[in-house]
Amino acid sequence: MTCFWDGILNGLQKEDLNLYDILNKNKEAFITFLKTKNEFDIFKNVRWNGFLLKKQEIKEHMEMIKNYDIRGIYNGHLTSTCDGFLLLVCSLFKLNINHRYLSCNIRYKYDGNIRGTLNVRSNRGHFEFISRS
């Protein structure tokens, strides 16, 4: 079950990937790339549901990303209501992300000039890309 990673990669366009010379949408390589960009200042450009992250929250997201086992992606990704990887994708690619979890809207907003908005949704067992605007 790699639906989380499939959803994120389906929402990214060639222009997004070209920003970092990412040549293809290989999930393992993409996660490895994200892990190399896991730096404190990256998270300071993102608002989650309108709020900037606190220093401790950033540290916790960084720790989760650092310890993420890429080999486990085929067992699914437990998407958090404030997910460190979605924060990272939002900041790195300068994209807003609207995540609808069941009936709850969760917003990741890049503080700066955005390049687009990813609309995704999930439930207790599935995550998918819906559209990009």
Where are these regions (language model features)?
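Papain-like cysteine protease catalytic cores
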Residues: 10-109
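Eukaryote-specific, cytoplasm-facing alpha-helical/coiled-coil scaffolding segments in long proteins
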Residues: 109-117
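A recognition module on extended beta-rich or small alphabeta surfaces enriched in W/G with H and D/E
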Residues: 117-133
